Structures are given as C-alpha cells and as structure tokens.
Amino acid sequence: AELKAEWAKEDATLASFKDTKHSQYGGDLSRKGKATGYFHVEKKKGKWWFVAPDGYLFLSISANGISPGGGGSIRNPLKGLYTDKAPEGFVAPQLPVMNRPQTAPQGAPQGMMRPQQPDKYIYLTAWNNFRRFGTENVQAKANQLVVDRMNYWGMNTIGNWSSRDVIALGKKPFMVSLSGLGINNGILGMPDVYEEGFAASVDEGIRRSVEPYIGNKMLIGYFVGNEPTWSNIELRLCELIMEADDARPLKKALVSYLQKNGDTDQARIAFVYETYEKFLSAVSTSLKKYDPNHLNLGIRYGSGVPSQEVLALSKKYFDVYSFNNYGLQPNLANMDIIYKATGMPMIIGEYHFGTTDRGLGESLVRVTSQKDRGVAYRNYTEKAFSHPALIGTSWFTWYDQPLFGRGDGENYNIGLLDATDRPYEWMVKAIQAVSENCYDVHSGKKAPFDQIPERAGGTFPDFWE
C-alpha cells in the first residue's frame, strides 16, 4: 500500500507538469540558431551547440539505458534464494545489449537485442509495471511514464542502449548506435578491414541500422562504437594480431606492411592508424550515402586522451567527438587537449556516482549518500557544460542494476530509479537544476555549481579498461 501510494503521488505530480520553456524538440525557446529540419551543430560566439530541427539551441541531457523496466538479473544465483514469480501476463523485455568485444557473442552485431529469457532472468523492475498499471495497456502506460518523467526532470534526450518502444513514441530526441560494423569480430575492438567483403558488410550493416530512422527528426545522430580497447595500447594490439592465426587477413596485412616498411614500433603504430582510417572511411561513406541528414557522433572513447593521430582521424570523419569520463569531476584539462587538436563539439557518453546505502555496489565513482549523488551530479554536469565544446552529457544508467547483478555480475547503485520504480529524489532535483542552468552556464552568463560531495571515496578501478 505504501509503495502504491508513492506511485500515485508521482503520477499526480507528473500529470500537473507543463513545460513552457522548450520547443517540441527540446530546444531552448530563448536561443536561436539556423533551422535546417534536422539536428546539427553550430558554433556561436565561441561556443558549440546542438541546434534542434526548428532552429532552437539544444544541450543534450541524457541517460543510457532508458526503458520502462530495466535489464533483468540472473535467476537464483544461489540455489533457491529467489522464489518469486512473474506477474500473470508478463512478457520479458527485449533490451539492447551493450557492445563490449570482451563479452559479446562471436559475430553478434553491435547493439543487438537480448533475447527473451524468462527462465534465466528476473525482471524485477519490469514486473513492477504490472503491479503499478495492472494488465490493460501496461506497456503503453509504462512507456508514457518514461516520457513524463523525462519531461518533469528536465532530461531531453534518450541515450544509448535505450528502449526502442520509448523511442518509437516520437516524443523525445534520441541517439542510437550503428550495428554490423565488424567491431566484435576484431581484435581489441579493431575490425578486420582486410577481410574479403568487409566494406560491403559494413555498408549493409549501416543500411539496416539507419533504415528505421531516415527522415526521423527526433534522431540526433549515430554512435559508431564504444571504448575501443586498442586506443593508447597500439603496440599491444599489434602483438595480439601477430599471435593470431596466419590465415587471418588482419595479420597478413600487418606482416606485409612490416615487410615493406620495416618492423619497428613506429611502423606498427602507423599500421594501426592506417587500419583505423580504413574502418572510419568505410563507415563514413556508407552513413553519408544512406542517411546524410543525421550526425555521426563518433566512437565513445575512454577517459584518456587518444594519440594526436587518432584525434586527427576523429576530426576528419566525425561530426561530434564523444568520450566516456568516470570521475568526481569532468576532466576539463583533457577536454582542452582534445579541443585544441580537433576544434570539435563534444559529448560525454557515460559517467555516474553511487553509494552503498541501498545495499548495492558503490559504482565506479563512490560518494557517501543519496544526497551526495545529487550534489556530485550537478557539480560534474554543470562544470562539463562550462566547457565551450561540451554539448551533451549522458548518465549511466536509468535504473539501478539488480541486486543479484546483471549478466556479468555488476550490481551498482547508479540508477535514477530504484528496483521498486521510485525516483531518487536528490538525483531528480539535481537534474532539474542542471536543466534550468546549463544554457546560462554554457553561454558564460552563470558560473557552474561548485559544491562538491563530502567525503567522496574516489574512483573504483574500471575492469572494462
């Protein structure tokens, strides 16, 4: 009864909210750029901006994994520990799988859909949709709740790995990943561009990826990949290529290159960049062919600064430079280095803060309370938007991870919502404050929020790196 009362209170709050400050695409009605009919980027008075299709300036405030029901967890990790049953009529959600070369099945396309596995996964958050809405039109009601929450919170963009049903409502701008690019079949995330038919395969993958979105004015753009492992360890990549099967085209190409240019560290690194450019060129050519109206949001690099050669290639082929940056603060010094080399607008694709006070893991960046999660979010996000190139941030992730862990066991307190489908109050307040202030912060009219969380524990090692 207490939980249903809280849900009802939230429903009433959401129903009474009206947004009068933003256009239908989420742009700031007080700031104008050029209307082109699609999202694009513009530099005005030394600051980069997204510009919405109707011409209003737009800063993207987003979260990854936005969905009406989370991702599920492994059933009964300890035999007999969990015996609850799914509500009658429940259908397991199909959610995009994060593309990590270390875990994706061999040959799996980037952004593939996880199959329904009701016998393996416990979908606690999705079950709550049935408890909240009953069985009539439950999915439609749950999808609309996502949009209503985004409106009230001030979150204007559906981030990566999110529900296609929510995207299909056509009520919020969104970003998606391209599929079928050969990344998962590569080595350390470097595709084998020398494989017979590689360009044709990429072309077909992109054609299929963009087909549902051509002409969709809510789409901001496409990501090409996520955290390429080989970046800044190019020599290690070459070692692994040389250890591969002799029949592998990528190895044959490296051996041939070194025979012609000498087997030196410089030659090996040069081969990596030449290979990477072949990949980026193939992707760029096909993307422009099939969908020239939407942005190439690039590969979300890791937290460090890639080499100058990689930065130059990013400038050549991407419209926006994207990177993930876990830390108590955005790394403005690194952003300055990247901006000096590329002059490009930027997106932070992942960051988060967590704590242990809900019985979950602390996350990659630890603070000591739910209040401090909100403080950390506002501090980080407004400081990020104070950079002249930063035009978007995407929190990771929408829901807390399950207590028993997602597929790889990760169980962090990193959600905007908990397992009982209740928003974290301090996070909501922080997002609302960022939404209210970010345009003035970015334009230089207002200083970013400078309070920092008390006794924050710093950064936990990221074992994905």
What are these regions (language model features)?
Residues 161-166, 180, 223-229, 300-304, ...:
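Short, solvent-exposed turn/loop segments enriched in Gly/Ser/Thr/Pro and often Arg
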Residues 270, 274-285, 289-363, 382:
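Glycoside hydrolase catalytic-domain groove-lining segments
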Residues 238-252, 396-465:
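Aromatic-rich peripheral "rim/lid" segments of glycoside hydrolase catalytic domains that contact
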Residues 55, 150, 158, 222, ...:
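Conserved, mostly hydrophobic/aromatic
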Residues 216-221, 225-226, 351, 365-418, ...:
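Substrate-binding cleft of secreted/luminal carbohydrate-active enzymes
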Residues 66-81, 169-184, 217, 224-260, ...:
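Aromatic- and acidic-residue-enriched segments that line the glycan-binding/catalytic groove
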Residues 2-169, 187-218, 262, 266-274, ...:
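Active-site-adjacent substrate/metal-binding segments within catalytic domains
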Residues 121-129, 185-192, 265-267, 302-303, ...:
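Active-site clefts of carbohydrate-active enzymes
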